[in-house]
């Protein structure tokens, strides 16, 4: 399997040498965005160099202010992205069943400074997206999901990337789908030009050849990362099946263990 994938990747990157276009939203980058939109059943995918920058620049693009309710049970990046935007994280405890945010405790944490909720899907378990949506609508809050653990998951026929105002994915090499390093922001609808704003923010805030209208960063996914993503996406269903078999084996052995 590994030898086959290596040869497939070599074939994929030959186009990069032929085009002499190594980065800056080239053909592989654009192709991967389109393929992921189809796979995730979402209107828009914006690729980034890594998941952290995807989340940090998404928060910036949505102009959040004040306080953001999030979970302490997550990788450090989630909180760092909030703090690096000058916002205050307010931690909501998790429930003991699946370690996602305890929705019964969210409203008590909302103040007049709260602008958003950033829940985290954990170990493939989705948050209570319906309850969170109801709370957010009631209090006029944005919802951004850290979906790094749930690539490809569906709920009631909807892809995980379609919930909330937007979702962030990590495509780090440890994930079931990866681009070596990488990440993405996914969302439905136009949302006041969010795709264009994200495009600018990950490219130094450059809007066009003469206009720089935001303080941005260099967070573009390069062509070699995108090529790896295109290769891995073709085999993703098989990789998910492999992991499912491993989970089933662990569950069986632990369930029958005397320890």
Can you name each region flagged by the protein language model?
Residues 60-147, 154:
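PLP-dependent aminotransferase-like
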Residues 47, 70, 185:
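Conserved SAM-binding loop
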Residues 11-31:
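A glycine-/small-polar-enriched, mobile loop at the entrance of the PLP active site in fold-type I
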Residues 17, 150-156, 163-257:
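Active-site region of PLP-dependent enzymes
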Residues 29, 33, 52, 72, ...:
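Short amphipathic alpha-helical/adjacent loop interface patches that line ligand
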Residues 1-7, 255-259:
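Conserved small/polar residues in nucleotide/adenosyl-binding loops
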């Amino acid at each position: 399997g590994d030898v086959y994938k290596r040869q497939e990747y070599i074939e994929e990157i030959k186009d990069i040498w032929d085009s002499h276009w190594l980065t800056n939203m080239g053909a592989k980058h654009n192709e991967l965005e389109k393929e992921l939109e189809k796979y995730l059943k979402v209107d828009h995918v914006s690729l980034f160099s890594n998941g952290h920058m995807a989340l940090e620049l998404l928060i910036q693009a949505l102009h959040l202010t004040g306080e953001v309710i999030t979970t302490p049970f997550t990788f450090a990046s989630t909180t760092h992205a909030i703090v690096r935007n000058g916002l205050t994280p307010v931690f909501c405890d998790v429930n003991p069943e699946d370690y996602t945010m305890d929705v019964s405790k969210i409203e008590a944490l909302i103040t007049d400074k709260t602008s958003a909720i950033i829940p985290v899907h954990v170990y493939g378990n989705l948050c209570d997206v319906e309850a969170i949506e109801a709370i957010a609508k009631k209090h006029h809050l944005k919802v951004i999901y850290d979906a790094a653990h749930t690539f490809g998951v569906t709920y009631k026929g909807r892809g995980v990337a379609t919930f909330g105002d937007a979702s962030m994915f990590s495509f780090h090499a440890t994930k079931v789908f990866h681009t070596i390093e990488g990440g993405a922001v996914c969302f439905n609808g136009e949302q006041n030009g969010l795709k264009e704003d994200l495009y600018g923010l990950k490219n130094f805030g450059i809007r066009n050849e003469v206009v720089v209208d935001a303080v941005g960063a260099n967070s573009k996914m390069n062509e070699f990362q995108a090529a790896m993503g295109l290769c891995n996406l073709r085999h993703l269903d098989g990789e998910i099946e492999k992991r499912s078999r491993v989970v089933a084996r662990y569950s069986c052995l632990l369930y029958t263990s005397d320890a």
